[in-house]
Amino acid sequence: MYLFDSLKDVAQEYLTEPQIEALRQSYVVARDAHEGQTRSSGEPYIIHPVAVARILAEMRLDLETLQAALLHDVIEDCDVTKEDLDAHFGSSVAELVDGVSKLDKLKFRDRKEAQAENFRKMVLAMVQDIRVILIKLADRTPNMRTLGALRPDKKRRIARETLEIYAPLAHRLGIHNIKTELEELGFEALYPNRYRVLKEVVKAARGNRKEMIQRIHSEIEGRLQEVGLPARVVGREKNLFSIYNKMKTKEQRFHTIMDIYAFRIVVDTADTCYRVLGQVHSLYKPRPARMKDYIAVPKANGYQSLHTSMVGPHGVPVEVQIRTEDMDQMADKGVAAHWSYKANSERGGTTAQIKAQRWMQSLLELQQSAGNSFEFIENVKSDLFPDEIYVFTPKGRIVELPMGATAVDFAYAVHTDIGNTCVGARVDRTPYPLSQSLKSGQTVEIISAPGARPNAAWLNYVVTSRARTKIRQVLKTMRREDSITLGRRLLNHALGEHSVNEIAPENISKVLSDLKIASMDDLLAAIGLGELMSIVIARRLLGNADELTEPSKSGGNKNKLPIRGAEGILLTFANCCHPIPDDHIIAHVSPGRGLVVHRETCPNVRGYQKEPDKYMAVEWTKDYDQEFITELKVDMHNRQGALAELTNVISKTGSNIHGLSTEERDGRLYTVTVLLTTKDRVHLAGIMRKIRTMPHALKVRRRKN
């Protein structure tokens, strides 16, 4: 029982005698179940579950969690069933052990799929009972401590998985001590040489800093004693992985990171925190822009503290965190601080526990709308390490977003419907680009319009997984709706004098059956997406090719499909020729892209008369309602200010420039290629006339192909 005694010493500090006895019984079952089994390192297997349970006991977790930790491998590795555990220890312990075991049982085609699906399963188990992930994190820690016994490739894989998933999860749940240990062990296993070198230089640097650390410590402590503010002042050392990350991601030099002297001041009440802040600011010159109040507005993982940055003795940077004892516990243990497990409840609990519960609920929504495990893991990873900003709604509600979030992210954070109908934003009462990042303290107002729909381009700049998932969801629906609408138009056009509604039901049923397509909507969607040709389907539906429209022989406008330019995401204007209203146009259906419109003179569609079935006669309607992009080439003298004059002239015509490039022809001349917006050929002719009046413009022409 000597192994159990090491766990008992910690657990008896907060568990009752009957609970310790119940824990001992769990240990005996686990010990007997693992009899004769050893770890990769050669040590008896039972050492591992005891180490896991001890980590959780140090976090003061409840009896059921400690029992499940001792038993977490018995279902997987031994002849013990979930029913056995239920009979001996109750359903709660059995469910916890089963939840942890299931994460390791899954079999997949490849390692990448396994990691993605395992992660999805882990998150779902965590949403059911957060203790599952606490056991999993505690399980990972001793595994990382004993990595030395594994093959180098396996060691690297586990270390990378730990740094990418488990350490960020511990951070997101606010469990600082586990997060720090996992990062250090993962860093050492993945990059042993970098770890060793960095450890040596950090050790040397810390030795040189002792005198300055002692001086700042004494000055802060002395000032607080002078004014009668009892406090505990401790120096903070950055861990090696944190230093390495800053050097890599922020491209900071080693001495820049090590030159910062960091301290933590722990006091009794939140009110004292602010009084201490005033005293340290009177001692050293503060940097106002670097002051952060995480007490009034806690971080996403429940972390609370005042952060301030100051200029210390001899100009050295001094960083101070000020917090209460409770906040210090929370910063170290996160959701496990003041542990009291309440199933499916947000009522009560610490800030960290409530925020974790909300976060996990949002993960459940992500899982339900994600297309697959890879999409899910991509979305959740973006939420694991958020540097937060805090912005306000016009009514003063605080909205917490990750750093880099845009007005679109804000809109979806407020409500899905607001995000879906967003057409613009005002920040601090001023128009603000949807793609531009927000900053803390801004007041954001979303301009929405009924009937507006998400834009696929938003996916290029949103940063929250919620926004990304909701946008993809709507785009999938839009794509289907648009493909059905376009498919109906294409089929009606191919049917000539007939329409889809006139086709006999038995004909439709036969075609659907022959093609193994479930419904008419699916058939229309396949036509709209270019997977089936409308002319072929029309022939099969009618059974009489003579009644069909022949696009190549129809000179009259009545057989041309009208184009407005706003048909949806399944109508594309070809980039090779940039057609605009009043151009003679031709179209073809491209698989997956829908209808692609070209100018008739475009080299890419020159052979359309030879393959009439692949092309469709189209024409512009009179009520097109958008701007179109086209391309101009301008030959100019190489003179200072000529390019600026060109862009100014284009701007005055009401056109926007979407792209611009230059090509030097010789020392005196160059050609400017401009992508710009225009309403139609008349508008474009006006733009070209204005350019021709420029003194440095020699020739302006529209790109032919």
Swiss-Prot record:
Catalytic activity as recorded in UniProt: guanosine 3',5'-bis(diphosphate) + H2O = GDP + diphosphate + H(+)
TGS domain residues: 387-448
Domain ACT: 631-705
Source species, domain of life: Bacteria
GO molecular function: GTP diphosphokinase activity; guanosine-3',5'-bis(diphosphate) 3'-diphosphatase activity
Cited CDD domains: ACT_RelA-SpoT, HDc, NT_Rel-Spo_like, TGS_RSH
Parts forming coiled coils: none
Domain HD: 45-144
Keyword Manganese: yes
Pathway listed: Purine metabolism; ppGpp biosynthesis; ppGpp from GDP: step 1/1
UniProt entry tagged with the keyword Manganese: yes
Classification via SUPFAM superfamilies: ACT-like, HD-domain/PDEase-like, Nucleotidyltransferase, TGS-like
Effect of inactivating the gene: Essential for growth, it cannot be disrupted. It can be disrupted in a relA deletion strain (relA phosphorylates GTP to ppGpp).
One GO-annotated biological process of the protein: guanosine tetraphosphate biosynthetic process
Cofactor: Mn(2+)
EC number(s) recorded for this UniProt protein: 3.1.7.2
Transmembrane segments: none
UniProt keyword annotations, A-Z: Hydrolase, Manganese
Family membership noted in the UniProt record: Belongs to the RelA/SpoT family.
Subunit (UniProt): Interacts with CgtA/Obg (AC Q9KUS8) in a yeast 2-hybrid assay.
Function in brief: In eubacteria ppGpp (guanosine 3'-diphosphate 5'-diphosphate) is a mediator of the stringent response that coordinates a variety of cellular activities in response to changes in nutritional abundance.
Name of the protein this chain belongs to: Guanosine-3',5'-bis(diphosphate) 3'-pyrophosphohydrolase
Gene this chain is encoded by: spoT
